[in-house]
């Protein structure tokens, strides 16, 4: 991609962020759900869930982070589908900007949105008893890894948003895919007691690896709660980065190609 793509992309990203400023409900509702999950699991279910060797709340919060940024990526697909439906993409075609810039701006603005959501969730987590036990560089690496994974997922959602006819379909399709992925994982409970088949799926689920990587980097881990024998969870940072690279390599070209088709309809 040339430098012009990123300059134009920054302009598109600013346009998307201004929309959040003008309609703050978008940010409010994107944070209400994870806050409710934190409060529900911390105060209602948390007393019934035992994580060997550590506080359940410290085990839980990184999982909520992972779930939230992944669900937040659906905004990318829904936003693009909405722009197509309202004819905004046709207006972009008339401007002297790179076609790829629309996608770069859309995914970039959603990273900023995820940063805001993570900040709000972190404050909520600190209130309910979550603590970062690692060093500052490790904690920053944990947040960056979560954002990198969310950025990769946003390109999948961008491709989906350019394929389907409306934002509603994007939301329904992404819910059907992402919801099972975030629950057949170690987001809320360790996978040690899962049935054999589900345990194998959960251990190699990239959602589990990004969650475990975040726990490691935040210092929210316990040897007793770790899953032995699964390379993906013994080296979650590498496994997650591998998924990020593969997703970007595959879905950036697919999304750009699909955008060109959508823009030429």
Ranges and model annotations:
Residues 28-32, 166-186:
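Pore- or pathway-lining transmembrane helices of multi-pass membrane proteins that form conduits
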Residues 36-41, 57-128, 149, 157, ...:
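Hydrophobic alpha-helical transmembrane segments of multi-pass membrane transport proteins
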Residues 41-50, 128-133, 137, 164-166, ...:
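Short helix-capping/hinge motifs at transmembrane helix termini and TM-loop junctions
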Residues 42-47, 82, 91, 126, ...:
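Transmembrane helix-loop junction
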Residues 1-33:
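Aromatic- and glycine-rich beta-strand/loop motifs that create alpha-glucan
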């Amino acid at each position: 991609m040339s430098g012009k793509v990123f300059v134009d992309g920054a302009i598109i990203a600013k346009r998307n962020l201004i929309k959040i400023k003008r309609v703050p409900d978008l940010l409010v509702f994107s944070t209400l759900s994870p806050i409710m999950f934190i409060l529900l699991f911390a105060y209602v279910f948390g007393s019934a869930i035992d994580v060997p060797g550590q506080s359940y709340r410290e085990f839980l919060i990184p999982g909520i982070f992972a779930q939230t940024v992944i669900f937040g990526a659906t905004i990318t697909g829904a936003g693009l589908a909405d722009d197509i439906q309202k004819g905004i993409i046709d207006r972009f075609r008339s401007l002297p900007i790179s076609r790829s810039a629309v996608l770069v701006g859309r995914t970039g603005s959603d990273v900023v949105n995820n940063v805001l959501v993570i900040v709000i969730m972190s404050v909520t987590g600190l209130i309910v008893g979550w603590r970062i036990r690692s060093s500052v560089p490790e904690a920053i690496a944990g947040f960056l890894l979560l954002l990198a994974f969310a950025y990769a997922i946003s390109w999948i959602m961008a491709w989906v948003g350019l394929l389907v006819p409306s934002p509603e379909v994007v939301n329904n399709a992404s819910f059907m895919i992402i919801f099972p992925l975030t629950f057949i994982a170690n987001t809320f409970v360790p996978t040690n007691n899962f049935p054999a088949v589900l345990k194998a799926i959960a251990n190699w689920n990239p959602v589990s690896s990004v969650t475990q990587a975040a726990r490691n980097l935040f210092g929210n881990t316990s040897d007793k709660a770790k899953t032995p024998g699964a390379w993906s969870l013994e080296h979650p940072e590498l496994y997650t980065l591998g998924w990020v690279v593969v997703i970007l390599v595959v879905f950036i070209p697919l999304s750009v190609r699909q955008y060109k088709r959508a823009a030429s309809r």
